[in-house]
Amino acid sequence: MSSGCLLLLLGLLTLWAELTPVSGRPRLCELPAESGLCNAYIPSFYYNPHSHKCQKFMYGGCGGNANNFKTIDECHRTCVG
């Protein structure tokens, strides 16, 4: 194999390893609960990786991160399995 092919293969394997979560769940499930910048009080759910459960929190309505679900069922489907 040429060195170019080997470098391409190494790069693809590195990319695959970085994008594959170790736990089998999406990386967004590892993010902390973040209420965001606004002041609305929207009941929402986030996955808590320490307790391995979906928990309720109040979302402010803007900003925040992807670990934010409208329903506990959506949180379970995404992060619990």
Swiss-Prot record:
Subcellular location: Secreted
PROSITE patterns: BPTI_KUNITZ_1 (PS00280), BPTI_KUNITZ_2 (PS50279)
Tissues in which the UniProt entry reports expression: Expressed by the venom gland.
Domain BPTI/Kunitz inhibitor intervals: 29-79
Source domain of life: Eukaryota
Cysteine disulfide partners in this protein: C29-C79, C38-C62, C54-C75
A Pfam short name: Kunitz_BPTI
A GO term for molecular function: serine-type endopeptidase inhibitor activity
Annotated signal peptide: 1-24
Function: Snake venom serine protease inhibitor.
Keywords: Disulfide bond, Protease inhibitor, Secreted, Serine protease inhibitor, Signal, Toxin
Similarity comment: Belongs to the venom Kunitz-type family.
Annotated InterPro entries: Kunitz_BPTI, Kunitz_BPTI_sf, Prtase_inh_Kunz-CS, TFPI/VKTCI-like
Cellular component terms per the entry's GO annotation: extracellular region
Main localization category: secreted
Presence of the UniProt keyword rRNA-binding in the record: no
Record flagged with keyword Cell membrane: no
Name by which UniProt lists this protein: Kunitz-type serine protease inhibitor spermatin
